[in-house]
A protein has these predicted regions:
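Solvent-exposed beta-strand/loop surfaces of large extracellular or lumenal domains
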Residues: 90-96
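Histidine-/acidic-rich catalytic cores in large beta-rich domains
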Residues: 6-85, 96, 100-104, 108-115, ...
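RTX-like calcium-binding, glycine/aspartate-rich low-complexity repeat tracts
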Residues: 1
Length: 571
């Protein structure tokens, strides 16, 4: 976790709080607290390891999770192993340290729609076994079901397990479900739609923070655990519409806005970044990017996301922000400017812009980065139109998401990896790419803010072509062993299998050959970056075509994913 003490530096002032804070009277929090207390109270001296109290899905929100209530006469270690009775799934193990008296142990990784065997053992000796029968997964999309559970298919099995990063693939679909897959593509955890699914991150205590469009348009933030227990409910004055980033154990950073209208004459949204103290739920700093960048520069891509008022200008659309401590910068991604930029953490002064050099006002020219090779030699001559076009098509990011820091402690150096969606790949319609001719990719950038240059040591995604083209959202996560988990998470196709865009005319040029129906077929991969070897691949789909007549104008947003991680079930 980050080492810079948040309170040791002077950040910009927060906005005045209206209703923001922790709702200590939230009914769901109070109910879950009572359920936990009741489960714990039921554990008596009779509930030894050989006679444990087993409670499946105690909160009604995590159907593949259970509690094991165990009374211990002394401190001891116990290994809990979970597997389906038929032994078709990989076992999930966790070593617990029991305390004297009652213990309530989360049992995670159950398999849906079958009998599960939970074995307690010590020193390789089984002590007791229990059986829990789980319900089927929720229904998938159909004429009667919208926002159903995804259909998951493994398209490349994990045949070289030794090269895989440990853990489970955690995925969140827009207003559908948060869930986790094992490396065989089997669902081993999910929470019900009582919780937001979209803006989803695990914090230091092992809990998750989430917001979504479906839950009061990103104004309700939930903190819950793998058992589906809600711990804290936050009321937000302004939307947390994208990418919550944990700064430290008690502080988060997230894109925000003036949801009820700006205090000036601008009619804009999604153009700020908020810092919030989790212990109080209050904002401690706010960065207003309308005072940093040019609000009049034409957006590309553009558009209005579901739930946004069309009369409000989404000129920047910040979808990711984080703190670079080495250089004391706030780094942010502005999708609608196709720009990643850095501002001074204390003064908000602009430090750099990673973007095509086209159409920026003269005042911003000094902040634009020059692409160079590994020797520092410029890759393009921007006095030539052909070089401008080449950089647009091959170097710069377009409509990017998920800017994630790569550690670099050298002063003046900023490294990150970004998901380059690739919308248009030009500011000129005549030079832009249609979705069937386009691609999305992940890109590693190294920014030298002393020299104002940027280098690109790695990219991946062109190999998939239009199969991986995602006109919005998507994510990736770098693993401890160097592997990269990447989710091409808005791959959408018409009834003829042609790649299409989420908002033609705004997210891409209009494709006259596109059909009238849409269905998502998202790609999850784990790759070894050195060889760009695909170690595992699975797809997620709704399995059900949507169209404007039956599903409304947003039908092309069939199924999307905003975040992907690979981590342990047990935090």
């Amino acid at each position: 976790m980050n080492t810079l003490a948040v309170k040791s530096i002077a950040l910009p002032a927060p906005r005045p709080a209206i209703n923001q804070g922790i709702d200590i009277n939230n009914e769901m929090v109070l109910s879950h607290t009572a359920i936990y207390a009741d489960c714990l109270a039921q554990v008596t001296q009779e509930n030894t390891v050989e006679n444990a109290l087993m409670v499946l899905n105690p909160y009604g929100t995590a159907p593949l999770s259970a509690y094991a209530g165990v009374w211990s006469l002394e401190p001891a270690e116990i290994l809990v192993t979970v597997q389906d009775v038929a032994k078709t799934a990989m076992p999930v193990e966790h070593l617990y340290s029991l305390t004297t008296g009652e213990n309530l142990l989360p049992v995670l990784g159950l398999v849906a729609d079958t009998e599960n065997r939970i074995v307690f053992s010590q020193a390789d000796t089984p002590l007791a076994a229990y059986t829990l029968t789980t319900q089927p997964l929720p229904p998938v999309d159909s004429a009667d079901v919208v926002l159903g559970f995804p259909i998951i298919n493994v398209t490349q099995p994990a045949i070289d397990a030794d090269k895989m990063a440990p853990g489970f693939y955690f995925i969140t679909h827009f207003d559908r479900y948060n869930y986790a897959l094992d490396q065989n593509g089997l669902v081993r955890w999910y929470v019900t739609q009582d919780y937001p699914s979209y803006n989803f991150v695990r914090i230091d205590n092992g809990h998750f923070l989430t917001t979504s469009e479906a839950k009061n348009t990103y104004l309700d933030m939930y903190e819950f655990d793998m058992m589906g227990r809600l711990y804290t409910f936050y009321n937000l004055d302004n939307q947390f519409h994208h990418s919550i980033w944990p700064w430290d154990s008690n502080t988060i950073v997230a894109p925000s806005e003036y949801t009820s209208g700006r205090p000036d004459d601008l009619k804009t949204n999604e153009d700020g970044v908020s810092v919030v103290d989790l212990t109080s739920g209050l904002e401690t700093a706010y960065y207003d990017m309308a005072k940093v960048l040019d609000t009049t520069r034409v957006s590309r891509p553009s558009g209005t996301a579901p739930g946004e008022a069309p009369t409000v200008k989404d000129w920047l659309h910040i979808n990711q922000s984080y703190v670079n401590e080495t250089n004391q910068l706030l780094i942010a991604s502005g999708r609608h400017q196709s720009a990643v930029f850095g501002v001074d953490l204390q003064t908000q002064a602009l430090r750099f812009i990673l973007s095509t050099h086209e159409d920026w006002d003269d005042a911003y020219q000094p902040y634009l980065l020059t692409p160079v090779d590994s020797e520092g030699v410029a890759l393009y001559d921007f006095s030539k139109q052909e070089d401008i076009d080449a950089a647009d098509h091959d170097f710069w990011t377009w409509g990017q998401h998920n800017v994630v820091e790569i550690a670099n402690d050298a002063p003046g150096m900023v490294e990150f990896m970004v998901f380059d969606n690739g919308n248009y790949r030009s500011r000129d319609d005549s030079k832009s790419l249609l979705p069937p001719d386009n691609y999305s990719r992940i890109v590693h950038f190294v920014v030298n803010i002393n020299e104002m240059t940027v280098m690109r040591p790695f990219e991946y995604g062109k190999e998939l072509g239009a199969r991986g083209y995602s006109s919005c959202v998507s994510a990736k996560a770098i693993q401890q062993n160097g592997n990269i988990v990447v989710h091409f998470a808005d791959c959408t196709f018409d009834e003829n299998g042609r790649a299409i865009s989420c908002q033609p005319g705004e997210s891409d040029i209009i494709d006259s050959q596109a059909g009238s129906e849409a269905m998502g077929l998202l790609i999850l991969q784990e790759i070894a970056p050195t060889e760009k070897t695909v170690l595992f691949e699975a797809t997620m789909t709704s399995g059900y075509y949507k169209n404007a007549e039956k599903n409304g104008e947003g039908y092309r947003y069939d199924i999307t994913s905003f975040r992907v991680y690979k981590m342990d079930l047990y935090a």
